[in-house]
Amino acid sequence: MAAILLLLLGFSWSLAVESALAPKESESSASAMLGAGTGAAATVSLSGDYSSLLSNVPAASPVPANPSQPSGPANQCSWSYNGTSSVHCALRLIERQPGLDLQGADGSSQLTIQCSELYLFESTLPVAVFARLQTLEALRLDSCKLLQLPNNAFEGLATLKSLRLSTHNSEWGPTRTLELFPDSLGGLKQLTDLDLGDNNLRQLPSGFLCPVGNLQVLNLTRNRIRTAEQMGFADMNCGAGSGSAGSELQVLDASHNELRSISESWGISRLRRLQHLNLAYNNLSELSGEALAGLASLRIVNLSNNHLETLPEGLFAGSKELREIHLQQNELYELPKGLFHRLEQLLVVDLSGNQLTSNHVDNTTFAGLIRLIVLNLAHNALTRIDYRTFKELYFLQILNLRNNSIGHIEDNAFLPLYNLHTLNLAENRLHTLDDKLFNGLYVLSKLTLNNNLISVVEPAVFKNCSDLKELDLSSNQLNEVPRALQDLAMLRTLDLGENQIRTFDNQSFKNLHQLTGLRLIDNQIGNITVGMFQDLPRLSVLNLAKNRIQSIERGSFDKNFELEAIRLDRNFLADINGVFATLVSLLWLNLSENHLVWFDYAFIPSNLKWLDIHGNYIEALGNYYKLQEEIRVKTLDASHNRITEIGPMSIPNTIELLFINNNLIGNVQPNAFVDKANLARVDLYANQLSKLQLQQLRVAPVVAPKPLPEFYLGGNPFECDCTMDWLQRINNLTTRQHPRVMDMANIECVMPHARGAAVRPLSGLRPQDFLCRYESHCFALCHCCDFDACDCEMTCPSNCTCYHDQIWSTNVVDCGGQQTTELPRRVPMDSSVVYLDGNNFPVLKNHAFIGRKNLRALYVNGSQVAAIQNRTFASLASLQLLHLADNKLRTLHGYEFEQLSALRELYLQNNQLTTIENATLAPLAALELIRIDGNRLVTLPIWQMHATHFGTRLKSISLGRNQWSCRCQFLQALTSYVADNALIVQDAQDIYCMAASSGTGSAALEDSSSNSGSLEKRELDFNATGAACTDYYSGGSMLQHGIPESYIPLLAAALALLFLLVVIAMVFAFRESLRIWLFAHYGVRVFGPRCEESEKLYDAVLLHSAKDSEFVCQHLAAQLETGRPPLRVCLQHRDLAHDATHYQLLEATRVSRRVVILLTRNFLQTEWARCELRRSVHDALRGRPQKLVIIEEPEVAFEAESDIELLPYLKTSAVHRIRRSDRHFWEKLRYALPVDYPTFRGNNYTLELDHHNHERVKQPASPGLLYRQAPPPAYCGPADAVGIGAVPQVVPVNASVPAEQNYSTATTATPSPRPQRRGEQPGSGSGGNHHLHAQYYQHHGMRPPSEHIYSSIDSDYSTLDNEQHMLMMPGAPGGLAMEAAQRAQTWRPKREQLHLQQAQAGTLGSKASQAAHQQQQQQQQQQQQQPNPTAVSGQQQGPHVQAYLV
């Protein structure tokens, strides 16, 4: 029975996946089927434990779970014994002096020394400290912070076989490492087990293992060894007689280190008998093919949890005895051919958690592994399974293919696996289960197919799997119960949850007579009728949660005699009458979150132990037949319903856990829990309980030491009147017949008294806060209640409310807020608190409160009180609190507070007090708090009153917001008092003095009330007490006495200078914004450049990406070229060739006054990546960074600053950086660009043919200009159709140049006109030349390059000369031919050179042509008068060419 109850504690279904790597994982159970049934499939258990290797090695005694902290000297042991041979020593640390006293371990064979983990101090191990322990066989040192293990540290332990040393130095610090020496293990010839784990080791010294020739187990886990060579196997040169170190080693654990690679030289081949190698949890990313060479005895290798991407061929070739290979959790994406070749003894291969694909797992991967039992390929990237993949794995029993992307499995793929009993194909992409998929799996007992895309299950798919016991088809796309299940007569658990099954009939589970667990959660099942489960006689767990079930027919489960647990939660059930009453075996029933309205205990079977009906609409826990002995429910969850009342019959007597929270319970019947002897917990929080009596929570007597039942009552609107005072004391009751309230801090009370907060936490209430209202009350011993003048009769005054506590020790009379002018009559004589605030009492008459000897608190604040008569508070001997604040009191004469010897708190703030006589406070011997702030007091010797009347009893005083005098004598005394009583004075920051302002004199202080407008407030410095009095506090003005009039001009000059400095600082700080504003609004460029080169072809050249051409043409260029004033802008992808060379780009920048870069992500990825553009920009800006303007996108700032070539420009202050997102973008851009207001000049080019007379120059073209083509026409949109057909002009060598070539053929919307020569036919021109040029380049196989657009400019830059010299540079095209042509060239006039340059270069477009012709003709006219013959010999170079060549 206990086992069954454990099965019923879970809600969700989970089929346990059996894994050979975790053999201790439990079989699927009934809790997994809610459940599931019990699995009985026999599995092969492969042990990963190597205790057989250590069977002859005694182990050190374990450390106690909670060892006592050692006390006393550091080296003094706190001994504990486990038997006669095992000893445990606990101490703080090991010190060299005095030596470690091990007398308590004499004769023992096992010793554990554990240092305190709380002391991070270095321990020192003396040499031969264990020499006296001749019989010791096992030694363990734990948590001792050793930094060195000296030579011969264990001398004398000749019989020691096991040594475990764990310093945990990494907890001390990353640099605290344990240093070993070659002879640290000297004398331990019998040592077989050495554990050096968790020591923060960096390396093992050479020859460290030489003294321990019989060592079999070496543990180096959790250290910081980074290279395999640092483990000391490579250079183990032991002397003669020492034997071969490591020859007997069988187990090596180097996991959890920092190894990155393993080469063939790490020396592990010396370990001939090594059987187990653990290198897991390192940083291995590379292995040598000879890393495991020589390990012929190796049986287990663990390389899991590393970073291996591939493995070398022949890695395991020398280890034919391998049994297990663990390669999980790496980054393997391929396996070399023959990796497992001839490993015929291999039993386990784990390749899970890698990146293997089906292209690298084929029929040769596992060939020859005929003894393989476990194969784990889970969490990889397999997409298909070939029918030959597992062709030789005849003895395979467990195959895990979980979490791949397998979408296709060939027929008969598992046919060779006739011993397979566990197959996991979960979390793949299978769509169909065909008839031949599981052929050959005759002994398959567990099949997992959840989380696929299965929608079709063919009828004969399981015909060869008749022994299947566990089947998981959850989370697929099934629409019905597969008919193929009828072949599984031995099936015990079936999971069909999370599918789309709508209905099933009486034949759906035919032949499943052994089925014990059925899971159908989260489907679309409708109603349940008789016969649906009739073929499941052994069904014990049924999960139908999260469906659409509205009704269950009576008798639907009559054939299921063994049904023990049912889940029907989250359905639409409205009635369960007669459905479950006959299920005598039912123990667990979940009906939560349905639509149940009616519930009765007659609906459930008598043996039910666990019932969940929360989240319904149940209004009462009915028990019509008053069943108590017949009900055995122990856990009942009826929360989140509509229950309004509970009583003794609502709760079974066997109940242990009761959850009825979040209901509408407003009444708990008395003794509702008395008969519940096993009650442990009741949740009643979040209900509607307002009143609760102590007897209503009474429980059955609980005998100690059994704990009291736990009740939770928070979240109820309790009205904490005088009947609820027990709630604070319930946990302190000693009768043990009441529960323990566990959430006392969460209980809140609705207070019946209107004073204070309406809702207060229970923990903050006092006993006198639990009050009940009354109108009239007469005590039992009072005999005068029938008479009018009866002092013992409690009658509440009219228009007042009165309250009392449980024992009438507190009597509150609240007459506040009535605005009455008369004190209430017949206030009860036993009143303890009286509220008279918020009324209108101009005068408090004498003897107004006579006879109220129990009055403790009186509130007369805010009642317009202007005077208090003599003996008003007479006979109030118990009064402790008196509130007179917010009234109109002006003077206290000294008799007001007589006989108030018990008064502790007096509130006089916010009145109009100007005078308080010294005797006023004398009777207040017990005063602890007084407030006189917010009045009109001028002088009050409060320090004398304090010393005379209060002494040390006064704890709080408030003096602020008065009109204290600034007279020297008074002010010194006041400031000294405040400074000396800083802990008592609560409002020192509000204390100030009032002095007469200038012109009024000291007479203003004589009547401060009438002259308040002529006073000025002055702050007081309480840190300068005792200082000499000055006229500052005497009433004079500062200007009259403090500052001489002669200093006024100097002060004015200083202020003017300060103002000027502030203005200059602001102008300097915002100088850039000011410049831009002045330029944008008035056209004034302040502090601009002294000289701006105006004789330039363009104002700016704009470098941008071709992808940004639309924005550049339609926005930037349009705004700049059409604005006022218009600018001449050269666009890179409009006015230059698309593949412009370095020289073309360089010249374009040199004839422009500014270089503008549109810095976008497209520009960085395209244009800036070109070497020609970067080189041109650098050359053009060399020494002139102010010429650069950068328009940058905000999102590319980080990428731009990451560019090492672009960063200097971005960090230079002379460069203009403008963000496109700046709201003053256009103003800043125009300010950064040069502006020349246009001057009208005459145009030398007209349409009249008579005005032009050009000579035709015939001469061979320069060889350096052969490979040039004209630029494309300058246009932005498709509307510019003129000149689109212009083609490059090419001039062959020695060809004559016609005069027509002096003019551009590339035009824009407005082409540049040229004159027509005499005899020239219209339409003739360069067409023939173009054809000739095309033939020339086609004949020579050459592509004509772009023509330089500025070669026709006759200016200071000498473009033709520059180009000639550039072409003569090494690597320039045509350099040698150019030099020869220049030597052979004779002198010609400048005009003739100009025509030659125009013929060779061509033009850019209309704008370039017009500007070029204008400059050419102007310069021609100037040069005709003074010809300047120049020898074009290559010896003279332009200034820019010389600078470039330098």
From Swiss-Prot:
Residues 716-773 form the LRRCT domain. Residues 1096-1233 form the TIR domain. The chain crosses the membrane at residues 1050-1070. The keyword Signal applies. LRR repeats lie at residues 133-156, 158-180, 188-211, 213-235, 246-270, 271-294, 295-318, 320-342, 344-368, 369-392, 393-416, 417-440, 442-464, 465-488, 489-511, 513-535, 536-559, 561-582, 584-605, 606-629, 631-652, 653-675, 677-699, 828-851, 852-875, 876-899, 900-923, 925-947, 951-979. One of its GO terms (cellular component) is extracellular matrix. InterPro entries: Cys-rich_flank_reg_C, Leu-rich_rpt, Leu-rich_rpt_typical-subtyp, LRR_dom_sf, SLRP, TIR_dom, Toll_tir_struct_dom_sf. Keywords: Cell membrane, Developmental protein, Disulfide bond, Immunity, Innate immunity, Leucine-rich repeat, Membrane, NAD, Receptor, Repeat, Signal, Transmembrane, Transmembrane helix. GO terms for molecular function: NAD+ nucleosidase activity, cyclic ADP-ribose generating; neurotrophin receptor activity; pattern recognition receptor activity; transmembrane signaling receptor activity; virion binding. Residues 1-16 form the signal peptide. One of its GO terms (biological process) is regulation of defense response to virus. Its main location: membrane. Residues 1301-1332, 1388-1446 are annotated as: Disordered. Residues 1071-1446 are cytoplasmic. PROSITE patterns: LRR, TIR. Residues 1395-1413, 1427-1439 have a biased composition (Polar residues). It is a single-pass type I membrane protein. Disulfide bonds join 722-772, 796-802, 800-815, 966-993. Belongs to the Toll-like receptor family. Toll-related receptor which binds to the neurotrophins NT1 and spz5. Essential for antiviral autophagy, it detects and binds to the vesicular stomatitis virus (vsv) following infection. This role is likely to be independent of the canonical Toll, immune deficiency, and JAK-STAT signaling pathways. Functions in olfactory circuit assembly by promoting synaptic partner matching between olfactory receptor neurons (ORN) axons and projection neurons (PN) dendrites partners in the antennal lobe. This is Toll-like receptor 7. It comes from Drosophila melanogaster (Fruit fly). The gene is Toll-7.
